[in-house]
Amino acid sequence: MAAKDVVFGDSARAKMVEGVNILANAVKVTLGPKGRNVVLERSFGGPTVTKDGVSVAKEIELKDKLQNMGAQMVKEVASKTSDNAGDGTTTATVLAQSIVREGMKYVASGMNPMDLKRGIDKAVAAAVEELKKISKPCTTNKEIAQVGAISANSDSSIGDRIAEAMDKVGKEGVITVEDGKSLADELDVVEGMQFDRGYLSPYFINNPDKQVAVLENPFVLLHDKKVSNIRDLLPVLEQVAKAGRPLLIIAEDVEGEALATLVVNNIRGILKTVAVKAPGFGDRRKAMLEDIAILTGGQVIAEETGLTLEKATLAELGQAKRIEVGKENTTIIDGAGEAVNIEARVKQIRTQIEEATSDYDREKLQERVAKLAGGVAVIKVGAATEVEMKEKKARVEDALHATRAAVEEGIVPGGGVALIRARTAIAGLTGVNADQNAGIKIVLRAMEEPLRQIVTNGGEEASVVVAAVAAGKGNYGYNAATGEYVDMVEAGVVDPTKVTRTALQNAASVAGLLLTTDAAVAELPKEDAPMPGGMPGGMGGMGMDM
């Protein structure tokens, strides 16, 4: 085990605070509508230019071990806030730096760090309650667009795209962000349920122009095993043919004689069918087949439920208004399932989401909810160059997270105003002793900091603006983009409540840990091993011609 360097008390804290300041100073220049850019070096290709706080934070790694510890702790604030709320990373970093800076002064003057932390926690809890009171629900398209625009660094086109996507697929729908092929942003919406499996034979295509098979008002047969024997399918095929409607077969696989017979019937026009493989694998495949069954009002024909293919009737088949099957995707539009059953299934999956431990599982479950509840929208980001594309895509993803947070917990006036209002409301808060009161004071001072930084980045005098905003009421604040004092909500400068709340809580949590640190242990730098000597002498004369 390598030797360690152990540093105590003020020496440890001072070094860690230096690291906090280096990281925070690099991140905070990006805050607000007039925030500056930060250029990040790349090991290959051109540098990346960004105004995204968390991207800057993730790049920073310091040489000094103790400084790096401090920087990594604040980096944790940014990433945690990004994970929970999707935005507010720069605000959280600014708050953490302020709490650490003010707190260190009190610790240096001999106050008890534990009492300071108790005071900080008390003030944060009161401020969070106050933010919830100020918050108002975010329901209209206009409000959603405003939140998206602010989060994407005042880019209204991104806000509009996200609002349009949410309008099309609902608040629960899946919205994904991809690289576009043109200069303009595009929005593709898939209504109904889509899964990534296409037709098993191109002979099923009945729309050669689009290269898809379209089934109008079809039955849907769901089976969890392979189908290779046509005899198993015959009874149900005869019933469907009598009904004079097309059929979609979704099974683990359809092969051999069964597939050949279906293709021949299709070509001759006897029975219009399309066969596709079931989506997913293992347990997820079973669950997705069950989802499709509930959406179409049918049943999965499986041995576990006591159903067999030979005995299947039309009652066990699902139905839909229209189904489109392409080479790689199948889309079921307007399934005949009961709304009550679909809602119950969505509720059940939501419970699984809450219990899920891995991000991958959670993401897949959320996709299933969206497919049942709404639809899928894809925002294709357009840009002139690769560098611009990456930067814009990161902003769109941030904005998307922020709008989801706004729909979830509502919105508050932006531009640092909500924290100023919450600060005014809790100004009379007191602790049980002078040290706790100092902790409360630290938070009250920190809550001004985001507004100060926004104003400073805009090149104005921060103290004057903070005093003017604090003297106002309600949504009255400073719009740094125009340099005017306005009603922030009317001007469209709003933040999701969840983002502001999470930023404050995470900043206080990590800053409190830093203030109560009394020793730091870091690995000592390894001394370079001496270079090996040259080859030993006396190698000549070994009978070789040199």
Swiss-Prot record:
Protein encoded by which gene: groEL1
Broad EC category: isomerase
Presence of the UniProt keyword Protease in the record: no
Region (Disordered): 526-546
Record GO terms (molecular function): ATP binding; ATP-dependent protein folding chaperone; isomerase activity; unfolded protein binding
Protein function: Together with its co-chaperonin GroES, plays an essential role in assisting protein folding. The GroEL-GroES system forms a nano-cage that allows encapsulation of the non-native substrate proteins and provides a physical environment optimized to promote and accelerate protein folding.
Organism expressing this protein natively: Burkholderia pseudomallei (strain K96243)
Enzyme Commission code: 5.6.1.7
Protein name in the entry: Chaperonin GroEL 1
GO biological process terms on file: protein refolding
Protein location: Cytoplasm
Region forming the signal peptide: none
